[in-house]
Regions:
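Basic, flexible Lys/Arg- and Gly-enriched helix-loop patches that mediate nucleic-acid binding at interfaces
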Residues: 1-138
Length: 138
């Protein structure tokens, strides 16, 4: 998503890439989302059991209002799948257009203090272990 920022995992290993995409890892993907509007916690609570979006049903979504500043609010979102533009579609469904989207974690991998444009290499053994590929990565 061109208008998103934050953590992105890059690899040139096809098996690793595929494994990272699958919801079967059970990994929680966390986002900080700035939306336009006055956020109602009751609306966010509707996401706990998943919702019907277009042609699919989402899994459970953890959503919490972090701070309301004027007509914008920061919401934290946690989900275990990653369909195309899913966070934006979820917030649109609730009536809150997204004006900033930052992925802060992807399973065990955290954005931490990395600044925009910075990179950090993850040891292949760590990735292999986290994905259950045990010594398969070269």
């Amino acid at each position: 998503d061109y208008d998103s920022e934050g953590l992105i995992l890059l690899t040139n290993n096809g098996e690793t890439s595929r494994k990272l995409e699958l919801p079967s890892t059970g990994w929680l993907r966390k986002y900080k989302v700035r939306v336009h509007g006055f956020v109602d916690n009751k609306k966010l609570d509707k996401l706990k059991n998943g919702i019907k979006l277009d042609s699919f049903r989402t899994g459970p979504i953890d959503a919490n209002l972090e701070i309301q500043k004027g007509t914008n609010a920061w919401v934290s979102i946690g989900l275990r799948e990653g369909k195309n533009r899913e966070v934006r579609r979820i917030m649109d469904y609730l009536g809150y257009p997204v004006n900033r989207l930052i992925r802060i974690s992807y399973g065990p991998f955290q954005l931490g203090n990395l600044q925009k444009g910075e990179t950090a290499e993850i040891n292949k053994d760590v990735v292999s272990n986290q994905l259950g590929l045990m010594n398969k990565l070269k």
